Amino acid sequence: MDTTAAPRPDLVELLSATTRRVSRAVATALAEDGGTLEGYRVLRCLAAAPGRTMGQLVAALHLPGPTATRVVDGLVDAALAYRLPDPDDRRRVVVHASALGRTRLARWEALVAGQEAALARSLGEDRVGALVQALTELVDDRD
């Protein structure tokens, strides 16, 4: 019998495992309504600040440029977003959520809220609130 104990997971491993688990659950819920986690994130960003350039989306969402382009292409193909020339620089495009995209986002927000509520039931509202606050501080410190 092996008596060596496995090393206790460190913060990076715990955050990575938690991210994978929560992302998988949210992605599964969104997929039931034809959505993706990345598409949801992009639409949320567009709803919060309409008229974002691709560079702004990449920076705000911490996505690689090609991934952001692929996600926006999918949203445009599904009529959930559209592109217009940037009024300040005609060489660039500005991405907007369409009316259909805003409607779909409202449904996706409800699905994500359901996943967040399940997490709150599992851990407790206070602990989830403290976790959100701590993670927000970490992200704000990095930006």
Where are these regions (language model features)?
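N-terminal leader segment of winged-helix/HTH proteins
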Residues: 1-33
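C-terminal regulatory/oligomerization modules of transcriptional regulators
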Residues: 1-6, 126-143
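Charged, amphipathic alpha-helical coiled-coil/dimerization segments
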Residues: 73-133
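Short amphipathic alpha-helical segments with heptad-repeat character
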Residues: 12, 16, 20, 62, ...
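Short, locally clustered residues in the helix-turn-helix/winged-helix DNA-binding domain
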Residues: 19, 44-48, 109, 136
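A broad helix-preferring feature
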Residues: 23, 54, 69-76, 95
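N-terminal helix-turn-helix DNA-binding core of bacterial DNA-binding proteins
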Residues: 24-67
